[in-house]
Amino acid sequence: VVNSISKTGNATGWRVGWAISPKAYTPALRAFHDTMVIQAPTPFQQAAVTLLELDRSSYVAIRTAYVSRRDLLVGALRHVGFGVSPPQGAYYVFARYADVPRIGGVSPVAATQHLLKQVGVACVPGDNFYAAGGSTSHYLRFAFCRSLSTLKNAAERLASLG
């Protein structure tokens, strides 16, 4: 079992996680781990312990907040023509933009630049996550791990595309 506090703990980038394995595998896991990462800072580890000690209602509240944010962003993207399948466990949306007015016929980089400079919404080209020019050539990635007010503002800005 491998897990982390990244999404649940709103601590992306902290790289605090753990692995549970049969004793026979532990030396190999440690050797691999030692070559891949450094120790997480002590305050991050202490924060992770605090997170793991929360009661179930805290996790339900975190999930509810993410679902609200996801649904807001997905609705805003669909409203202007993005093709979107709502994610079930991530805090980002991978959206097809081929049918979106003003950006449908351009490259992923040009689409992200237009959205940032003309609309005021930041996203990342889908090609950053897959081979360029493949089936992801008309996809953009939007994150919804922001405040609800920031996402509402982004939704209003995205509406200008339609």
Model-derived segments and spans:
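PLP-dependent class I/II
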Residues: 1-162
